[in-house]
């Protein structure tokens, strides 16, 4: 019971303003943080232990077309973007406000001194802040992760 209570007190939430974009106004907060009720936020439990690549948090931009709802017809493009945070991941409470650790938005991370642009050439992609799914497949396979299983 005490373990569960301690775990509940360590829960983090991510707050996203409902009328914003490009990573503006996003906050990672603890359970006891007070927030203004005047501002509209979408709150979600924060994934505190995400899968990391080389110590960096990342997300996937997947392109999907829904051309019909009845009958349902969905097309998923076979490539997409892997967007990285530009500072190594940390759950240290002193780092919760560091946007370059917790956010993967391109519009946020392009302002980081650690941002690495691959200039769209695909060369040196694995050391850049944005990858193709081809580079992700390579990284997964080098680490014993089945790309096909993940995307099945």
For each feature predicted by the language model, list its residue ranges.
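Catalytic core of tubulin tyrosine ligase-like
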Residues: 4-152
């Amino acid at each position: 019971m005490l373990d569960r209570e301690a775990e509940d007190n360590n829960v983090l939430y991510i707050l996203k303003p409902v009328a914003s974009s490009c990573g503006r106004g996003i906050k990672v907060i603890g359970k006891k943080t007070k927030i203004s009720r005047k501002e509209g936020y979408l709150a979600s439990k924060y994934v505190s232990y995400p899968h990391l690549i080389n110590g960096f948090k990342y997300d996937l931009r997947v392109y999907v077309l829904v051309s019909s709802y009845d009958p349902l017809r969905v097309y998923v493009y076979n490539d997409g973007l892997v967007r990285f945070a530009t500072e190594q991941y940390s759950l240290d409470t002193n780092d919760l406000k560091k946007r370059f650790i917790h956010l993967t938005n391109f519009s946020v991370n392009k302002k980081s001194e650690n941002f690495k642009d691959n200039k769209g050439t695909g060369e040196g992609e694995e050391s850049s802040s944005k990858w193709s799914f081809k580079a992700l497949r390579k990284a997964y396979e080098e680490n014993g992760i089945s790309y096909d299983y993940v995307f099945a």
